[in-house]
Amino acid sequence: MEMEALDILFEDLAHPNPYIQSQAFMAMVRDWPQQALPRLLGLLAQPNITLRRASVRGIGAFGAAALLPLADLLKASTDSTIRASCVKAYAQVASNQPGIHFPESAMKALEEALSDDSPVVAVATVMALGQVGGQAMPLLLRVVGGDNPAQAVAAVNALAQIDHPAIERTLRDLQNQPQVDSYVRETIESALARMSDLHARQPQPG
């Protein structure tokens, strides 16, 4: 009978209404954490995009409990769709709980995903690291200085979203590096302009 109740929640997860999906996975987190998380991870291979995206959101609601299982799946899977979904679930966790500490194995899995054979996974990883925040700064800075302009551009935009006093100074230093790709440099200039504009809009202490 109890498992039937969980099965009903998984049926609700496939509902097209995002509110019903949210109610379902929040009930899973509250009442069925041990049983629901492995099933949600199993749905990351789901060809139904609506259900797969709902599963990513659901995993994100589990917070710290999802970090190590996601690392294991991300490193083990040969399916690029599953790997991309793992990365997106990491972004959900970080978005839901700003400042949450990612354990070393989770950061290592994300670091390895930066050089994934799938460009979709690699770029999604950069965006996820932007959600992780200050803890991900060293990895993002390495990407900006790397030889993949598409990833570097995504990394600049991710860095610009992190609230850390060293970001602006670091981007200005990178802007003056001669080896930086011209498109990446333009992105840095745009990011710095946005950051300056944001600072100008903030109320000054009286």
Can you say where each PLM-predicted feature lies in the sequence?
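Short acidic DE-rich linear segments
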Residues: 202-206
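Structural detector for internal amphipathic alpha-helices that build alpha-solenoid repeat scaffolds
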Residues: 1-3, 11, 19-33, 38, ...
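Core helices of alpha-solenoid repeat scaffolds
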Residues: 5-6, 37, 67, 103-107, ...
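Alpha-solenoid HEAT/Armadillo-like helical repeat scaffolds in large eukaryotic proteins
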Residues: 8-12, 16, 39-47, 69-78, ...
